[in-house]
Regions:
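Acidic, Ser/Pro/Thr-rich low-complexity regulatory regions
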Residues: 1-172
Length: 172
């Protein structure tokens, strides 16, 4: 289901998800390796790609800003609202691509932002509540009910990607 994405976009996404604690430093280093192999050459990208597995957590903060700057990709402060919005857009994009289920997107948004921390994510938290409600009762949820809710989530994911202030935000 995934359409091929360029390695620089994948590095951006890995950096965004790391900035909100959803991805690991190693994910970023691996994405830098892929970008380097694909021709995104530069001394900072090469240094980031060369970080050892054991040193990824300690070296990333020092090397990532220059590497992203070389690639013309934005750097987000860890746990900033800008990073959270960008991460939400990355995961919304993955849901639309079929790489993340609608339920996984709503669950992450609800656990991460609740109902009032990030207004852009609130509709996903509400949809997560609806998924939870489908699970109650003596009979499991109907396939049609789940499919309808999945469709609502994907509509919301599109709205998130089209929202004002969209940087690259996970779009191809």
């Amino acid at each position: 289901m995934t359409k091929s994405r360029d390695p620089v976009s994948k590095l951006h996404d890995a950096a965004v998800l790391w900035a909100v604690g959803y991805g690991s430093a190693l994910d970023v280093v691996r994405a830098a390796c892929d970008a380097l192999v694909a021709g995104a050459d530069g001394p900072s990208v090469a240094m980031l790609a060369g970080v050892s597995v054991r040193q990824a957590d300690t070296e990333l903060r020092n090397l990532l800003p220059a590497a992203l700057d070389e690639l013309g990709s934005p750097l987000y402060a860890e746990n900033s609202e800008e990073a959270e919005v960008a991460a939400l857009k990355v995961l919304a994009s993955r849901a639309l691509a079929g790489d993340l289920s609608s339920r996984e997107l709503t669950d992450w948004a609800h656990r991460t932002f609740g109902h009032d921390r990030l207004p852009l994510a609130e509709p996903l938290a509400a949809l997560d509540d609806q998924y939870d409600m489908l699970g109650y009762g003596p009979v499991g949820p109907s396939t049609a009910a789940v499919a309808a809710l999945d469709t609502e989530v994907l509509t919301e994911a599109r709205r998130i990607l089209e929202s004002a202030g969209s940087d690259r935000g996970g779009k191809d």
